[in-house]
Swiss-Prot record:
Keywords: PQQ biosynthesis
Family, per entry: Belongs to the PqqA family.
BP GO terms, sorted: pyrroloquinoline quinone biosynthetic process
Reported function: Required for coenzyme pyrroloquinoline quinone (PQQ) biosynthesis. PQQ is probably formed by cross-linking a specific glutamate to a specific tyrosine residue and excising these residues from the peptide.
Protein's pathway: Cofactor biosynthesis; pyrroloquinoline quinone biosynthesis
Record keyword Disulfide bond present: no
Listed name of the protein: Coenzyme PQQ synthesis protein A
Covalent cross-link Pyrroloquinoline quinone (Glu-Tyr), where: 16-20
Top-level taxon in the UniProt lineage: Bacteria
InterPro entries per the UniProt record, alphabetical: PQQ_synth_PqqA
Length: 24
């Protein structure tokens, strides 16, 4: 992912957090 849009970054961050919580 080479996007530099803040919206995309926020979405990706939220997605990573969700995956982390699901993997716990």
């Amino acid at each position: 992912m080479m996007w530099t849009k803040p919206e995309v970054t926020e979405m990706r961050f939220g997605f990573e957090v969700t995956m982390y919580v699901c993997n716990r």
